[in-house]
Amino acid sequence: MALNKSMHARNRYKDKPPDFAYLAGKYPEFRQHVQTTLAGRVSLNFKDPEAVRALTCTLLKEDFGLTIDIPLERLIPTVPLRLNYIHWVEDLIGHQDADKRVLRRGIDIGTGASCIYPLLGSTLNGWYFLATEVDDMCFNYAKKNVEQNNLSDLIKVVKVPQKTLLMDALKEESEIIYDFCMCNPPFFANQLEAKGVNSRNPRRPPPSSVNTGGITEIMAEGGELEFVKRIIHDSLQLKKRLRWYSCMLGKKCSLAPLKEELKIQGVPKVTHTEFCQGRTMRWALAWSFYDDVQVPSPPSKRRKLEKPRKPITFTVLASTVKELSIKAAAMGWDAVEGIAVVRAWIEKILADLKVQHKRVPCGKDEVSLFVTAIENSWVHLRRKKRERVRQLRELPRASDDVLQAMEEEKNSQNSVSNSVDCEKSKTEDSETELVAPDEDVHLTADDELREESATKELSEHMEEEETEAKQTEASFNEGSSSAEQGAQPSEEAGNLTAEKGQSPKETSRCFLFKCLMNVKKEGNDVLVEMHWVEGQNRDLMNQLCTYLRNQVLRLVAS
């Protein structure tokens, strides 16, 4: 039940939802409506009116000792949601801090067949209720429910004419000051709204429970907005006859115009709240003409946060840490062991990349760096290296046909020089013979030298990549999988960005991304975590993580 954690703090169902299995074992009437899955989970069909009624009656009996009857043709209340409203009224009138011996008086406008608010308020707090009802069936059931629970001395159910709210109901009791009024107004203005045809977002899923309310319970002229405005109009005449006026709303969009109406009318004290239960949310509005009442603070605005993501991690094994410590000591560093030496090497790599970083406060046995990447310098280095190897591969090389033609020409020149008897010709031929082979050898040697150089650097590059892969497999545990998975696509994304020539200044932000890096002990090893903060692309952080990991391994391998 997604919204249960947002229930009223005193709601008994907030941290302990109803145990259907226990209730089914104790109450036969409820047992016939539950289903048990193959996994042993007990569930209830909230689309079945009889099942919903059985749950409400069972909860009232089990948790409050109340026995009620509700017709299937009328609204079946959910107990946790109604309990939220009762607890909020307690907050409004200061019930928790007041003398419990002082009788509190309330009015329930349209109490319904269950008469649930008066029954709960009287049972929990000993409040006196005047409960009004316009529907004959609801009135009869409400009276019966009050009588069978022996609460007639605290709850008075009265039948009133249609459209009667507060003014007519209080005509006979002009001297009594009530502490509060409660109301669940009809939410809808017509049948289309009641069926959700023209009021629900098309992307919103359908209601998860059945609606059994009668016409007067769920529909009124103008819907809940106009209904509550009529209560506001009555309150402007009654004013201090009630300390608090309140209503529950089914639509959030009704809240703002009603608050604006109260502001226009000059009502001095106004507050609101939210009621949460399961996947259902309701809103409540309260106002008062008393200056001495304590106004509960409205709920704070909850920011919609991104779903928390796991950090990108890699582990530096104890053996690797030891090698890093030896190298750090040889360089005369102060940090030569544990997380300090890993942090020091990472700081050096970041500095070489010109990635901004600073140390920030952190927990015990760990160090933290706040990292801000301005440009994608790590991909630039990899690209330059790949480009150099590619150029060496593509150096010009003479073809076999050219080499053969040059060899034939040399042989023909040798044969011509041998046929000349003149000493001068011999000398010239010999010089020619010496020059031609020298030129030929020089060209061949140059080609071979370039080939050898290209082959050697390419071989070194391939060996380096192979060593890097082996070291990665040997030194990093499964925690680095998230970084490895992001490396390939992230590199492509980085290349694409660079090819387009987009500098940070050309974007709306002056940085690529920000992250928090934690370096901490994990047994004998050291764990490096990178937590995303904000930026253009999370893949960029994957790239940097992969680069840092590989550079740390390269330090040990070199």
From Swiss-Prot:
Q: Where is the composition biased (Polar residues)?
A: 477-488
What is the top EC class of this enzyme, as a single word? transferase
> Sorted alphabetically, which SUPFAM superfamilies does this protein's record hold?
S-adenosyl-L-methionine-dependent methyltransferases (SSF53335)
Which GO biological process categories is it annotated with?
mRNA catabolic process; mRNA destabilization; mRNA processing; post-transcriptional regulation of gene expression; regulation of mRNA splicing, via spliceosome; rRNA base methylation; S-adenosylmethionine biosynthetic process; snRNA (adenine-N6)-methylation
Q: Which residues bind S-adenosyl-L-methionine?
A: 82, 110, 114, 133, 164, 184
How would you summarize its activity regulation? Methyltransferase activity is autoinhibited by the K-loop region that blocks S-adenosyl-L-methionine-binding. Upon activation, K-loop changes conformation, allowing S-adenosyl-L-methionine-binding and subsequent methyltransferase activity. mRNA N6-adenosine-methyltransferase activity is inhibited by zinc.
GO MF:
mRNA m(6)A methyltransferase activity; RNA binding; RNA stem-loop binding; U6 snRNA (adenine-(43)-N(6))-methyltransferase activity; U6 snRNA 3'-end binding
Its EC number(s)? 2.1.1.348, 2.1.1.346
Q: Where is this region: VCR 2?
A: 511-558
| Segments for region (RNA-binding) | 17-20, 199-211, 250-254, 277-283
Cellular location(s): Nucleus; Cytoplasm
InterPro entries in the record: METTL16/PsiM (IPR017182), METTL16/RlmF (IPR010286), SAM-dependent_MTases_sf (IPR029063)
At the top level of its lineage, which domain of life is listed? Eukaryota
* Gene3D superfamilies in alphabetical order: Vaccinia Virus protein VP39
Q: Region annotation Disordered: residue ranges? A: 407-502
- Name any GO cellular component annotation: nucleus
Region annotated VCR 1, chain positions: 289-400
Q: What reaction is this protein's catalytic activity?
A: adenosine in U6 snRNA + S-adenosyl-L-methionine = N(6)-methyladenosine in U6 snRNA + S-adenosyl-L-homocysteine + H(+); an adenosine in mRNA + S-adenosyl-L-methionine = an N(6)-methyladenosine in mRNA + S-adenosyl-L-homocysteine + H(+)
The Basic and acidic residues compositionally biased stretches are: 439-461
Annotated spans, K-loop: 163-167
In which family does this protein belong, per the annotation? Belongs to the methyltransferase superfamily. METTL16/RlmF family.
Record remark on domains: The VCR (vertebrate conserved) regions bind the first hairpin of MAT2A mRNAs. The VCR regions interact with the internal stem-loop within U6 snRNAs, inducing the conformational rearrangement of the A43-containing region of U6 snRNA, thereby modifying the RNA structure to become suitable for productive catalysis by the methyltransferase region. The K-loop region occludes the S-adenosyl-L-methionine-binding pocket. Upon activation, conformation of the K-loop changes, allowing S-adenosyl-L-methionine-binding.
The task this protein performs is described as:
RNA N6-methyltransferase that methylates adenosine residues at the N(6) position of a subset of RNAs and is involved in S-adenosyl-L-methionine homeostasis by regulating expression of MAT2A transcripts. Able to N6-methylate a subset of mRNAs and U6 small nuclear RNAs (U6 snRNAs). In contrast to the METTL3-METTL14 heterodimer, only able to methylate a limited number of RNAs: requires both a 5'UACAGAGAA-3' nonamer sequence and a specific RNA structure.
Q: What is this protein called?
A: RNA N(6)-adenosine-methyltransferase METTL16
- Record the organism: Gallus gallus
* Designated gene of the protein: METTL16
